[in-house]
């Protein structure tokens, strides 16, 4: 409980600056990086339907260690989803420390954003909004995977037919949140050196472009794949 209080106040009981917020920031970054990488892999995985149902089922079989046991061990993907869910909830808890605590703080930040018109601040705003949406949407999706049994192309196609709007929205939320998060991780943890501030800003913009292009391309492919899922 003491560590929890220190994490929010930033001070220890003796008045000295606590290291807890820094530790929480580090773990927030680690869990965020894991989830952002998982989203990249997830988009590639779901997009294999573009190569046909057999290709998708083959990837599922590989993930379920069919090459080791001779048959698909379906519970492996459920365990992976459970681990990702734990990482996801941990990341959400750590990230909520920086969310507006009440409506007044929400209005203050929105006014601050509108006055500054600073791109990185606006990006954080989108990350905040998509993070809030993902807390519910991604949780529902992961819980469905954890308790949904064996995954195959036919079962996934049925799910897309029933919840096509949900999956489209989930894709948008994931891509926006993860791409902004990866860019912010780069800015936060990677040293950006330069002769002057213009060179530093140029390097930062280059990193931003690379991150957004990677996620953007995979998102477009995944979006096309979503329409293919619906057509099956």
Would you name each region that the model predicts?
Residues 1-232:
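Membrane-embedded alpha-helical bundles that constitute the cytochrome b-like, heme-associated redox core
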């Amino acid at each position: 409980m003491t560590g929890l209080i220190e994490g929010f106040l930033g001070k220890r009981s003796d008045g000295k600056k606590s290291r807890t917020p820094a530790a929480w920031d580090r773990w927030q970054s680690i869990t965020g990086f894991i989830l952002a990488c998982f989203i990249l892999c997830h988009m590639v995985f779901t997009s294999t339907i573009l190569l046909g149902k057999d290709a998708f089922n083959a990837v599922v079989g590989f993930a379920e260690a069919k090459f080791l046991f001779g048959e698909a061990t379906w519970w492996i993907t459920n365990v992976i989803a459970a681990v990702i869910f734990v990482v996801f909830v941990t990341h959400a808890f750590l990230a909520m420390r920086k969310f507006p605590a009440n409506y007044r703080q929400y209005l203050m930040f929105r006014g601050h954003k509108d006055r500054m018109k600073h791109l990185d601040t606006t990006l954080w705003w989108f990350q905040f909004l998509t993070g809030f949406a993902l807390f519910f949407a991604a949780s529902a999706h992961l819980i469905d995977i954890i308790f949904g049994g064996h995954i195959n192309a036919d079962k996934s196609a049925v799910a897309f037919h029933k919840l096509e709007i949900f999956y489209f929205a989930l894709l948008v939320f994931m891509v926006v949140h993860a791409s902004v998060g990866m860019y912010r991780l780069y800015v936060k943890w990677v040293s950006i050196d330069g002769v002057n501030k213009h060179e530093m800003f140029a390097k930062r913009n280059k990193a931003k472009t690379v991150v957004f292009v990677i996620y953007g391309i995979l998102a477009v492919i995944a979006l096309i794949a979503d329409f293919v899922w619906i057509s099956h």
